[in-house]
């Protein structure tokens, strides 16, 4: 019989373009799922990989700032065409992150429900709440042999637009103005 829990501890793991320091990974088989937990200087969270149904990621904090090496094409040659992405085998995922830092930017609370519907990936309950401003969104990304299209619809909301802009390192002339902006974007 195989063990129900497996744990790995390492001083550093290079994965996803980033070094994860003082990392402890564990996987535990539970009824109807496997729970993978990660704890390091850069992440503290768990992923519940359900046998059936959506996966669920509960993250207390994440600092993800990948450093990928740039690949240069030969002089005068065009860059290679982008690879097609297929959503068919992607799992549906519920993401809940209490404190997320991505590419050096503190995004704060991040939530998303991603669902796979064949050649379409949908976003419901998309949320980024920095504490200075809030974005909620729904979206759709469709890709198949006949078409490629994307849409994102949502709302930006905050009490003081200058504080929200300053949070992202931008200075604007408007001061102290509340904002409530709806957006509806489509592209192919």
Question: Predicted segment positions?
Answer:
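A short glycine-rich beta-turn/N-cap micro-motif
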Residues: 32-33
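Small-residue helix/turn framework positions
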Residues: 3-14, 39-78, 85-101, 106, ...
């Amino acid at each position: 019989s195989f063990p129900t829990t497996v744990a790995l501890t390492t001083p550093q793991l290079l994965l996803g373009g980033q070094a994860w320091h003082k990392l402890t990974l564990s996987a535990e088989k539970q009824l109807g799922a496997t729970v993978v937990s990660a704890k390091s200087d850069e992440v503290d969270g768990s992923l519940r990989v359900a046998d059936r149904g959506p996966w669920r990621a509960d993250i207390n904090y994440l600092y993800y700032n990948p450093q990928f090496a740039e690949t240069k094409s030969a002089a005068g040659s065009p860059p290679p065409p982008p690879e097609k992405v297929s959503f068919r085998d992607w799992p549906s995922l519920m993401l809940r992150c209490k404190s997320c830092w991505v590419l050096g930017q503190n995004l704060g609370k991040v939530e998303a429900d991603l669902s796979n519907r064949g050649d379409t990936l949908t976003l419901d309950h998309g949320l980024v709440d920095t504490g200075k401003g809030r974005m909620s969104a729904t979206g759709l990304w469709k890709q198949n042999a006949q078409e490629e299209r994307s849409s994102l619809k949502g709302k930006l909301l905050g009490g003081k637009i200058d504080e929200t802009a300053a949070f992202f390192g931008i200075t604007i002339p408007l001061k102290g103005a509340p904002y409530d902006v709806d957006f509806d974007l489509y592209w192919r």
